[in-house]
């Protein structure tokens, strides 16, 4: 089968990482996969994919609404003649139109967040609803909670759930849960409102002086980074918070950390949590979106609200108990098998085959 994936571009983010993982896994299953990036920007992820032999076609999209993308995509679809078009994020606006113009190619759209957030406004929500109800695109939810929001928001009866997956072989499982002279807390994510960096910094600042040997490593970049660097200094923790930027390979940072924190305001199914699980890291995460479908509260992770005091208390529990760190980490490692890239790819293939059989 030939699958054509369409994505805005390969910045560092969960949807982009999922698209990369799915592309490799589909190819390993014997499928022909081509990727279209709307923007011309090359990144470490796109470079890595091209080095691995993945063909990426770039459209040089202009910022904002650019309807010239539709005929460009239509031309590519006619040239490539895919069996299925798989869209991510807001490319659904252009790609489904192009798929219809190119002969009615079946489309699958991964909903990477709760429905209202993922739609990015009323106009996009109306268009998505039209596409879904006409059967021009089939939404796939990342978790039961995301599925619930999609069925309610769009008034749909059938929304399949396919968990995100990662290449678990790239994870480096922890062997020891003892603490060194410095206790390393890790967060990975874009600096935007969703990831709640301000709340995370407040939680870290609340750790008592008995835990003054802690450091907080923040991987990622984004429009709020400079503001958060300033905020860390204002909270008096600038010396202990390390802003490390985007990293092409996060696995060594996960392996070297003592715990992973993700107190987001909302989520779909965070790839970073799967990678932390595959490393056997004890995890503190907010009880939002698909996170409770991934972590068993108190057994494979500590689930909290977004309140800094609650997040801080969970961190203290982990710092104070090697037994708890080991139990949560090992249970998370065992549970990570549910989220392999191969399993994800096989489930998507089932959906592709269902759609192509109906055509």
Report the location of each language-model feature.
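N-terminal strand-loop element at the rim of the active site
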Residues: 5-67, 161, 223
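A conserved mid-protein helix/loop that constitutes part of the nucleotide-sugar donor-binding site
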Residues: 13-24, 183, 187-206, 223-229
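Acidic anion/phosphate-binding donor-loop and adjacent secondary structure
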Residues: 64-68, 148-153, 163-181
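Short His-centered aromatic/hydrophobic patch
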Residues: 87-94, 111
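Aromatic "clamp/platform" in nucleotide-sugar-dependent glycosyltransferases that forms part
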Residues: 246, 265
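Short hydrophobic beta-strand element within catalytic cores of glycosyltransferases
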Residues: 282-285, 295
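Conserved acidic donor-binding segment of nucleotide-sugar-dependent glycosyltransferases
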Residues: 297-298, 302-309, 317-322
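A short, well-ordered alpha-helix in the C-terminal region of glycosyltransferases
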Residues: 310, 317, 324-338, 347-350
């Amino acid at each position: 089968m030939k699958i054509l994936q369409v994505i805005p571009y390969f910045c560092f983010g969960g949807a982009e990482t999922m698209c990369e993982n799915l592309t490799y896994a589909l190819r390993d299953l014997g499928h022909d996969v081509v990727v279209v990036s709307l923007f011309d920007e090359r990144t470490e992820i796109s470079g890595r994919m091209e080095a691995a032999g993945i063909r990426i076609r770039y459209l040089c999209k202009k910022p904002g609404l650019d309807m010239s993308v539709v005929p460009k995509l239509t031309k590519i679809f006619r040239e490539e003649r895919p069996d299925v078009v798989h869209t991510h994020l807001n490319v659904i606006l252009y790609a489904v139109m192009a798929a219809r113009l190119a002969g009615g190619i079946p489309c699958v759209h991964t909903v990477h967040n709760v429905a209202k957030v993922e739609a990015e406004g009323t106009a996009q929500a109306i268009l998505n609803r039209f596409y879904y109800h006409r059967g021009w695109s089939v939404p796939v939810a990342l978790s039961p909670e995301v599925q619930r929001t999609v069925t309610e928001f769009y008034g749909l009866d059938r929304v399949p759930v396919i968990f995100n997956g990662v290449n678990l072989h790239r994870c480096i499982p922890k062997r020891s849960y003892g603490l060194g002279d410095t206790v390393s807390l890790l967060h990975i994510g874009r600096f935007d409102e969703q990831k709640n960096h301000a709340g995370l910094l407040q939680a870290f600042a609340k750790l008592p002086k008995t835990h003054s040997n802690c450091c907080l490593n923040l991987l990622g970049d984004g429009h709020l980074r400079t503001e958060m660097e300033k905020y860390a200094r204002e909270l008096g923790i600038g010396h202990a918070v390390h802003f490390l930027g985007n990293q092409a390979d996060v696995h060594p940072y996960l392996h070297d950390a003592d715990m992973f924190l993700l107190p987001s305001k909302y989520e779909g199914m965070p790839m970073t949590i799967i990678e932390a699980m595959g490393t056997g890291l004890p995890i503190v995460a907010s009880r939002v979106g698909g996170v409770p479908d991934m972590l068993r509260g108190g057994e494979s992770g500590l689930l909290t609200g977004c309140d800094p005091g609650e997040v801080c208390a969970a961190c203290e529990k982990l710092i104070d108990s090697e037994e708890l760190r080991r139990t949560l980490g090992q249970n998370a490692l065992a549970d990570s098998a549910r989220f392999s890239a191969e399993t994800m790819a096989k489930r998507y293939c089932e959906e592709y085959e269902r759609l192509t059989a109906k055509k």
